[in-house]
Protein backbone atom coordinates (compact mmCIF):
# COMPACT_ATOMS: atom_id res chain seq x y z
CA UNK A 1 0.00 0.00 0.00
CA UNK A 2 1.13 3.55 -0.69
CA UNK A 3 0.30 4.50 2.91
CA UNK A 4 2.93 2.04 4.12
CA UNK A 5 5.60 4.09 2.35
CA UNK A 6 4.60 7.09 4.47
CA UNK A 7 5.29 5.25 7.75
CA UNK A 8 8.55 6.67 9.22
CA UNK A 9 10.12 3.29 9.93
CA UNK A 10 9.19 1.92 6.51
CA UNK A 11 10.48 5.09 4.84
CA UNK A 12 13.84 4.85 6.61
CA UNK A 13 14.28 1.26 5.43
CA UNK A 14 13.25 2.26 1.91
CA UNK A 15 15.69 5.19 1.89
CA UNK A 16 18.54 2.85 2.81
CA UNK A 17 17.46 0.28 0.22
CA UNK A 18 17.22 2.84 -2.58
CA UNK A 19 20.59 4.39 -1.75
CA UNK A 20 22.22 0.98 -2.26
CA UNK A 21 20.31 0.11 -5.45
CA UNK A 22 21.81 0.74 -8.87
CA UNK A 23 18.36 1.59 -10.24
CA UNK A 24 18.35 4.71 -8.02
CA UNK A 25 21.71 5.57 -6.39
CA UNK A 26 23.53 6.68 -9.59
CA UNK A 27 20.70 9.11 -10.39
CA UNK A 28 20.83 10.48 -6.84
CA UNK A 29 24.58 11.16 -6.98
CA UNK A 30 24.38 12.49 -10.52
CA UNK A 31 21.78 15.05 -9.44
CA UNK A 32 23.58 15.93 -6.20
CA UNK A 33 27.00 16.46 -7.79
CA UNK A 34 25.60 18.44 -10.70
CA UNK A 35 23.47 20.76 -8.54
CA UNK A 36 26.41 21.19 -6.17
CA UNK A 37 28.60 22.26 -9.10
CA UNK A 38 25.98 24.70 -10.45
CA UNK A 39 25.66 26.52 -7.15
CA UNK A 40 29.37 26.36 -6.40
CA UNK A 41 30.13 28.25 -9.63
CA UNK A 42 27.29 30.72 -9.13
CA UNK A 43 28.29 31.68 -5.60
CA UNK A 44 31.99 31.78 -6.38
CA UNK A 45 31.16 34.13 -9.26
CA UNK A 46 29.24 36.37 -6.85
CA UNK A 47 32.29 36.56 -4.55
CA UNK A 48 34.52 37.28 -7.54
CA UNK A 49 32.27 40.12 -8.71
CA UNK A 50 31.72 41.75 -5.33
CA UNK A 51 35.00 41.32 -3.50
CA UNK A 52 37.80 40.67 -5.98
CA UNK A 53 37.04 42.48 -9.21
CA UNK A 54 34.74 45.13 -7.81
CA UNK A 55 32.38 47.12 -9.98
CA UNK A 56 29.70 49.74 -9.65
CA UNK A 57 27.50 47.31 -11.57
CA UNK A 58 28.18 44.54 -9.03
CA UNK A 59 24.60 44.13 -7.71
CA UNK A 60 23.21 44.01 -11.26
CA UNK A 61 25.78 41.39 -12.26
CA UNK A 62 24.91 39.29 -9.20
CA UNK A 63 21.22 39.34 -10.18
CA UNK A 64 22.21 38.48 -13.75
CA UNK A 65 24.17 35.47 -12.46
CA UNK A 66 20.98 34.05 -10.97
CA UNK A 67 19.10 34.73 -14.21
CA UNK A 68 21.81 33.01 -16.27
CA UNK A 69 21.37 29.81 -14.28
CA UNK A 70 17.56 29.85 -14.09
CA UNK A 71 16.65 31.48 -17.41
CA UNK A 72 17.14 28.38 -19.60
CA UNK A 73 14.40 26.58 -17.66
CA UNK A 74 11.79 28.96 -19.09
CA UNK A 75 12.85 28.22 -22.66
CA UNK A 76 14.11 24.63 -22.69
CA UNK A 77 11.84 22.72 -20.30
CA UNK A 78 9.53 21.59 -23.10
CA UNK A 79 12.45 20.44 -25.23
CA UNK A 80 13.86 18.57 -22.24
CA UNK A 81 10.58 16.71 -21.85
CA UNK A 82 10.51 15.80 -25.55
CA UNK A 83 14.08 14.47 -25.44
CA UNK A 84 13.27 12.46 -22.31
CA UNK A 85 10.29 10.83 -24.07
CA UNK A 86 11.88 10.34 -27.49
CA UNK A 87 15.16 8.77 -26.38
CA UNK A 88 16.39 6.50 -23.61
CA UNK A 89 16.53 8.72 -20.53
CA UNK A 90 19.71 7.16 -19.18
CA UNK A 91 21.49 7.67 -22.51
CA UNK A 92 20.41 11.33 -22.67
CA UNK A 93 21.53 11.88 -19.07
CA UNK A 94 24.96 10.40 -19.81
CA UNK A 95 25.34 12.59 -22.91
CA UNK A 96 24.29 15.76 -21.07
CA UNK A 97 26.69 15.11 -18.21
CA UNK A 98 29.50 14.49 -20.69
CA UNK A 99 28.85 17.92 -22.23
CA UNK A 100 28.85 19.35 -18.72
CA UNK A 101 32.54 18.48 -18.40
CA UNK A 102 33.28 20.89 -21.26
CA UNK A 103 31.19 23.55 -19.52
CA UNK A 104 33.16 22.93 -16.32
CA UNK A 105 36.37 23.45 -18.30
CA UNK A 106 35.05 26.84 -19.43
CA UNK A 107 34.24 27.68 -15.80
CA UNK A 108 37.72 26.60 -14.73
CA UNK A 109 39.21 28.87 -17.39
CA UNK A 110 37.03 31.70 -16.13
CA UNK A 111 38.28 31.27 -12.58
CA UNK A 112 41.93 31.01 -13.63
CA UNK A 113 41.65 34.13 -15.81
CA UNK A 114 39.21 35.89 -13.45
CA UNK A 115 37.02 36.40 -16.50
CA UNK A 116 33.44 37.32 -15.66
CA UNK A 117 32.22 36.82 -19.29
CA UNK A 118 33.64 33.28 -19.36
CA UNK A 119 32.00 32.47 -16.04
CA UNK A 120 28.66 33.83 -17.23
CA UNK A 121 28.97 31.67 -20.33
CA UNK A 122 29.65 28.63 -18.15
CA UNK A 123 26.79 29.47 -15.80
CA UNK A 124 24.38 29.70 -18.74
CA UNK A 125 25.68 26.34 -19.94
CA UNK A 126 25.01 24.82 -16.53
CA UNK A 127 21.48 26.23 -16.70
CA UNK A 128 20.91 24.66 -20.13
CA UNK A 129 22.09 21.24 -18.92
CA UNK A 130 19.97 21.50 -15.76
CA UNK A 131 16.86 22.47 -17.77
CA UNK A 132 17.28 19.51 -20.14
CA UNK A 133 18.11 17.10 -17.32
CA UNK A 134 15.13 18.07 -15.14
CA UNK A 135 12.46 16.04 -17.01
CA UNK A 136 14.82 13.06 -17.10
CA UNK A 137 15.47 12.87 -13.37
CA UNK A 138 11.75 12.89 -12.59
CA UNK A 139 10.56 10.90 -15.60
CA UNK A 140 12.96 8.03 -15.00
CA UNK A 141 11.84 7.42 -11.41
CA UNK A 142 8.53 5.66 -12.30
CA UNK A 143 10.47 3.47 -14.75
CA UNK A 144 12.89 2.06 -12.19
CA UNK A 145 10.95 2.39 -8.93
CA UNK A 146 7.88 0.57 -7.66
CA UNK A 147 4.88 2.79 -6.89
CA UNK A 148 5.49 2.23 -3.15
CA UNK A 149 9.04 3.55 -3.59
CA UNK A 150 8.14 6.71 -5.50
CA UNK A 151 7.49 8.96 -2.45
CA UNK A 152 10.86 7.99 -0.98
CA UNK A 153 12.60 8.33 -4.33
CA UNK A 154 11.15 11.78 -4.94
CA UNK A 155 12.03 12.84 -1.40
CA UNK A 156 15.64 11.73 -1.83
CA UNK A 157 16.02 13.52 -5.16
CA UNK A 158 14.56 16.74 -3.73
CA UNK A 159 16.70 16.35 -0.60
CA UNK A 160 19.79 15.91 -2.77
CA UNK A 161 18.92 19.07 -4.69
CA UNK A 162 18.48 21.27 -1.64
CA UNK A 163 21.49 19.84 0.16
CA UNK A 164 23.55 20.51 -2.96
CA UNK A 165 22.26 24.10 -3.14
CA UNK A 166 23.19 24.66 0.52
CA UNK A 167 26.64 23.09 0.22
CA UNK A 168 27.30 24.82 -3.10
CA UNK A 169 26.48 28.17 -1.50
CA UNK A 170 28.78 27.52 1.47
CA UNK A 171 31.70 25.99 -0.42
CA UNK A 172 31.40 28.48 -3.30
CA UNK A 173 31.57 31.40 -0.89
CA UNK A 174 34.50 29.89 1.02
CA UNK A 175 36.47 28.90 -2.07
CA UNK A 176 35.78 32.20 -3.82
CA UNK A 177 37.27 34.14 -0.91
CA UNK A 178 40.30 31.83 -0.53
CA UNK A 179 43.72 33.25 -1.55
CA UNK A 180 44.17 30.29 -3.90
CA UNK A 181 40.59 30.51 -5.18
CA UNK A 182 41.33 30.08 -8.88
CA UNK A 183 43.13 26.77 -8.51
CA UNK A 184 40.72 25.36 -5.91
CA UNK A 185 37.63 26.26 -7.94
CA UNK A 186 39.02 25.07 -11.27
CA UNK A 187 39.88 21.66 -9.80
CA UNK A 188 36.55 21.37 -7.96
CA UNK A 189 34.37 22.25 -10.94
CA UNK A 190 36.03 19.76 -13.28
CA UNK A 191 36.20 17.00 -10.64
CA UNK A 192 32.50 17.38 -9.80
CA UNK A 193 31.53 17.32 -13.48
CA UNK A 194 33.55 14.15 -14.11
CA UNK A 195 32.05 12.43 -11.06
CA UNK A 196 28.53 13.44 -12.15
CA UNK A 197 29.19 12.00 -15.63
CA UNK A 198 30.54 8.76 -14.13
CA UNK A 199 27.38 8.48 -12.01
CA UNK A 200 25.20 9.07 -15.08
CA UNK A 201 26.96 6.23 -16.91
CA UNK A 202 25.75 3.85 -14.18
CA UNK A 203 22.05 4.75 -14.55
CA UNK A 204 20.23 1.67 -15.96
CA UNK A 205 18.60 2.03 -19.40
CA UNK A 206 14.97 3.13 -19.33
CA UNK A 207 13.91 2.47 -22.90
CA UNK A 208 12.19 4.97 -25.18
CA UNK A 209 8.78 6.14 -23.94
CA UNK A 210 7.74 7.63 -27.30
CA UNK A 211 10.20 6.47 -29.99
CA UNK A 212 8.19 8.06 -32.84
CA UNK A 213 7.82 11.48 -31.20
CA UNK A 214 8.85 14.38 -33.45
CA UNK A 215 11.10 16.87 -31.67
CA UNK A 216 9.96 20.48 -32.09
CA UNK A 217 12.91 22.49 -33.42
CA UNK A 218 11.53 25.61 -31.73
CA UNK A 219 12.21 25.08 -27.99
CA UNK A 220 10.09 28.05 -26.94
CA UNK A 221 7.13 26.73 -28.94
CA UNK A 222 7.42 23.31 -27.31
CA UNK A 223 7.45 24.90 -23.86
CA UNK A 224 4.37 27.01 -24.66
CA UNK A 225 2.62 23.91 -26.02
CA UNK A 226 3.38 22.13 -22.76
CA UNK A 227 1.88 25.02 -20.77
CA UNK A 228 -1.28 24.87 -22.90
CA UNK A 229 -1.51 21.13 -22.33
CA UNK A 230 -1.19 21.62 -18.58
CA UNK A 231 -3.91 24.28 -18.58
CA UNK A 232 -6.29 21.87 -20.28
CA UNK A 233 -6.19 19.63 -17.19
CA UNK A 234 -7.28 21.56 -14.10
CA UNK A 235 -5.71 19.06 -11.69
CA UNK A 236 -2.30 19.14 -13.41
CA UNK A 237 -2.43 22.92 -13.84
CA UNK A 238 -3.14 23.44 -10.14
CA UNK A 239 -0.28 21.13 -9.22
CA UNK A 240 2.03 22.96 -11.60
CA UNK A 241 1.12 26.35 -10.13
CA UNK A 242 1.69 25.08 -6.59
CA UNK A 243 5.10 23.72 -7.53
CA UNK A 244 6.04 26.93 -9.37
CA UNK A 245 4.96 29.05 -6.40
CA UNK A 246 7.16 26.97 -4.09
CA UNK A 247 10.22 27.56 -6.28
CA UNK A 248 9.49 31.28 -6.47
What is each residue range found by the language model?
Residues 2-248:
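Alpha-helical transmembrane-bundle signature of multi-pass membrane transport and export proteins
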